[in-house]
Structures are given as structure tokens and as C-alpha cells.
């Protein structure tokens, strides 16, 4: 008797991946389920047991919150990654980590393949498959949902036929993905770019009408670009981000309504909630403004934009991403200090910043009697700075006279 091929499935506990377990078994595979917690608050024990109940031969659950925070979210923070100037890469950040864990489990289980539950029109199929092939080119990648092309009703009928539990929230019109860096939401009424998102589409943030009428002022401390404490209380990075989700979300900070250009060539309307991420990005940027020299500060946005594109496009495990990360690491050596932020009515407003590496010299900046700036030096500087345009003007006037 020939031995069954083994596949490791990225398992969420939802309908698609539960049906995928049974479908893959029918295709002749021994299915191992693998579920990660990257901060969405899943009941891992329940998910593990459900996978076994549906038919998986083994079920892994992995608490990856701190790894996600340190190795992935931190890169996004230090690079201020906002795809198309808006999207902090919530889902795009978790996909390479999930792919990494799938490969690790596959190698441990001596599996020949890995599988994911992505459809054929989203970005995630690209992110998963490119990442997996980058980490282990020998693994086969299966995409059951993309292959079976069932309608929702057909999928439910298949689940009922095989005794697969159907989630109680199946009637929700939305497609939601969440991790500690934020929450993404699409489908339903959100597919109409003119329609206002209903409050039911949000979860991490309060509507402005229900936010407090008095602000919360917090102090966020950074060490070499890493946020380490809030109001003097130190947290592991994953807990710090989740804490900021609570604090900033209570004030309605971090709602994003965005029509974005997908990697696969279509436009998609997405609603995001990223209270912690947006607060941290703003605070970190202000501390960089205080501690980076002008040339680095002016060049870094070019690297940031490219990093956002690389991550969005599924190229986390690429030489270009590694090179960009090397630049970022160098810029963070002196990004140490404290930033004071006011959270109020949908805004995270930076009100103060300080650092032992501050390049701001009050005696040079002041207009009082304590001014230490050499005003006479400005005359020679202006002459040399404007010399190229002055020479150009002289030459142009000579040409005009000749004409």
C-alpha cells in the first residue's frame, strides 16, 4: 500500500479551511493543521480540537505574537510603512510569518506539500506562495479554495454532508483579518466605494460620537527605535502594541477607509483599524525628526516607500528586503527618547519629544538674547549656496543680449 502524501494546511478554524481538510483528504492527502496566534485573540485550544474533529491527523497551534511583533511589526514601524500613503500593511505583515511556520512544520513532519485557504483574486495567495518557495523550493503548494471554485452555498452543502461544524458568524457580510498590528475588513456593503462604512464594520475603535470628551495624554519611550514603555510601565513589544490598541482605539484613533491597488491588478475598497500602529508610527517619526541628521531624514522616506511596496507585494524573503532592513537598522542607533502623545477625538497628537541624542539646540534655534547662532556666517553661506543660479542668470542674460 502506497503511503499518503502529507500536507500542512494553514488552518484558521473557519469554514474555508475546515472544508479544505476534508477536501484534501479526498484528494489522497494526510492533512496536518497549523494555526498561528498573531494577536487576533483566537481560542487556540478550540481551534486545535476543531481541526482534529474535522479530520486532521495532527494539529499545531503556535503563539507567535511576540515573534510577529519583534520581527515583522517592528520593521513596519521603523520604516513607517504605509502602502499608498495609507495602509499600515496589517495582513501583508503576517503572511510571511505564517509561511515561515508552515515550512517549519512541514519539514518537521516530513510533509511533501503545504496548503493555504486563499482565493484566486486576492494578494495573499501571492504572498504565501512566493514566501514558501523562497524558504523551501521543494515543497508543493496547494490552494484548495482557488481550485474548487465553489459558491458559498455549495461550500455549506459540502460541510453539512461531511459533518463539518459551520461557524455561527457565517452570516456576517464581511471578510475580516486581524492581528496585533490592526484589523482589515472588506466585502458586503464595503464593496461600494460610495457607501459609508456602518459601525458594525468596526471593532477596535469607537465612533467619534462615543469617544471621551477629555483627552488621554501618554508618554511612549523608545530605545534604539523600539517602543519599550507607556507612561513608565515596560511591556513586551506585543503587549505594548495591544495596550496602545486599547488606549488609542477608545479615542477613535486609526480608522482608515482606502481604495487600494491590489497586487493582482484590481482595485479594492478596504476598511482598516490600526489604533496602536498609527499612534506608534506618528510618535516614532517625531523622535526621528529630533535625532536624525537632515540628509538621512530626507533620504529615509525613499527607503520607506520601497519597503512598503516590497512587503505588500509578498517579497519579505528577498535580497532587496534584506538590503532595505540593513539601512533601517543603521538609522535606529540613536532613536532613543520619549514622545508625549495626546489621544483625542480620532487624533494622536504629538505634544512633546525629548532625547539624549537630540540634535535640536535651543541656543541655536532661539530668537531671544540667548541666541548663539552666528548671523554673520549667513552672508558667505548665502553667496556660495546661490552661486550656481547666480552664474546661470549671468550667462542667460549675456545670451539674451547677443540675440
Curated annotation (Swiss-Prot):
The keyword Amino-acid biosynthesis applies. GO terms for biological process: argininosuccinate metabolic process; L-arginine biosynthetic process; urea cycle. It catalyses: L-citrulline + L-aspartate + ATP = 2-(N(omega)-L-arginino)succinate + AMP + diphosphate + H(+). GO terms for cellular component: cytoplasm. L-citrulline binds at residues 87, 123, 127, 175, 184, 260, 272. It is found in: Cytoplasm. GO terms for molecular function: argininosuccinate synthase activity; ATP binding. Keywords: Amino-acid biosynthesis, Arginine biosynthesis, ATP-binding, Cytoplasm, Ligase, Nucleotide-binding. L-aspartate binds at residues 119, 123-124. Pathway: Amino-acid biosynthesis; L-arginine biosynthesis; L-arginine from L-ornithine and carbamoyl phosphate: step 2/3. Its EC number is 6.3.4.5. InterPro entries: Arginosuc_syn_C (IPR048268), Arginosuc_syn_N (IPR048267), Arginosuc_synth (IPR001518), Arginosuc_synth_CS (IPR018223), Arginosuc_synth_type_1_subfam (IPR023434), AS_cat/multimer_dom_body (IPR024074), Rossmann-like_a/b/a_fold (IPR014729). The keyword Cytoplasm applies. ATP binds at residues 10-18, 117. Homotetramer. Belongs to the argininosuccinate synthase family. Type 1 subfamily. PANTHER family: ARGININOSUCCINATE SYNTHASE. This is Argininosuccinate synthase.
